[in-house]
Amino acid sequence: MRLVFAGTPEPALPALRRLLDSPRHEMIAVLTRPDAASGRRGKPEPSPVAREALDRGIPVLRPARPNSPEFVAELAQLAPDCCAVVAYGALLRDELLAVPPHGWINLHFSLLPAWRGAAPVQAAIAAGDIITGASTFRIEPALDSGPIYGVVTEAIRPTDTAGELLARLAVSGAELLSATLDGIADSTLTPRPQPAEGVSIAPKITVEQARVRWDLPAPVVERRIRAVTPNPGAWTVISDLRIKLGPVRLGAASDLPAPPEPLPPGAIHVDRKSVWVGTGSDPVRLGQIQPPGKKFMNAVDWARGARLDPAARAT
């Protein structure tokens, strides 16, 4: 089939590369979000998908308004048979969806109808799910609600961050998307409607929502931190400094003894080998932390240099 690939960030690259290397399909263009400011100077940079396409000599489409009549007409001129989508980053309206005869086939990183929305991997980790996966489905106007072509499952490891889990799903999902498009081309796949039961929503996580709530139970705190690692990144405030946090360890999973006395939520205990913070249940041990303007470092090394007030709290 003649394909247009729509995607923007790094996790879309395995699928793009898999389809570019497929002898079954012809990639006629790549659709991605406009260049965005990056780095300290704020210089506009092409998306990871745009860079890959340009390196491969594939035309790149970067409309600011993909649903505009002008772009709908431009896409129609290309006459794609199908459009494959992985984390494009914009909602698509009926006029655009109607252009390719085989529709727009999306790779979504959850087992639909669970975790529809922009942050399915983060939501699955935060919820304590032990199994997740990826689904291919035909895009309809309602959010992630179209009929499903195929799924692949993936176990969530106890220490998985969102970045680590997403990297695995991007690879297994690339194979699923390729197989789905092959089946559509061969007329051997029939999509099935999503069940009405089991629907859950995973909206984008804001920076403010990534602030750690130390009043929650320790297992919830630990999962939530992994769920926003590396983006947008967990953070807290200690001694008026905004500190980014890497994954933490639960007391039961730590190889070091917990503080001798219970810690109220947000209270900090520093000993020779560890930094502990109280939660709504048991304390957690900090691992890597990032003070303002510095790189990630061991929490103990930072605490020694910072000379924390004994009354300092994480808030």
Swiss-Prot record:
What GO CC annotations are associated with the protein? cytosol
One GO molecular function term of this record is: methionyl-tRNA formyltransferase activity
Q: What is its EC number?
A: 2.1.2.9
User: Which residues participate in (6S)-5,6,7,8-tetrahydrofolate binding?
Assistant: S110, L111, L112, P113
Taxonomy, superkingdom: Bacteria
User: Which InterPro entries does the record associate with it?
Assistant: Fmt, Formyl_trans_C, Formyl_transf_N, Formyl_transf_N_sf, Formyl_transferase-like_C_sf, Met-tRNA-FMT_C, Met-tRNA-FMT_N
Task: Kindly state which keywords UniProt assigns to this record, in alphabetical order.
Answer: Protein biosynthesis, Transferase
Q: Which reaction does it catalyse?
A: L-methionyl-tRNA(fMet) + (6R)-10-formyltetrahydrofolate = N-formyl-L-methionyl-tRNA(fMet) + (6S)-5,6,7,8-tetrahydrofolate + H(+)
Q: What does this protein do?
A: Attaches a formyl group to the free amino group of methionyl-tRNA(fMet). The formyl group appears to play a dual role in the initiator identity of N-formylmethionyl-tRNA by promoting its recognition by IF2 and preventing the misappropriation of this tRNA by the elongation apparatus.
Q: What family is reported? A: Belongs to the Fmt family.
**HAMAP family attached to this UniProt entry:** Formyl_trans (MF_00182)
- This chain belongs to the protein called Methionyl-tRNA formyltransferase
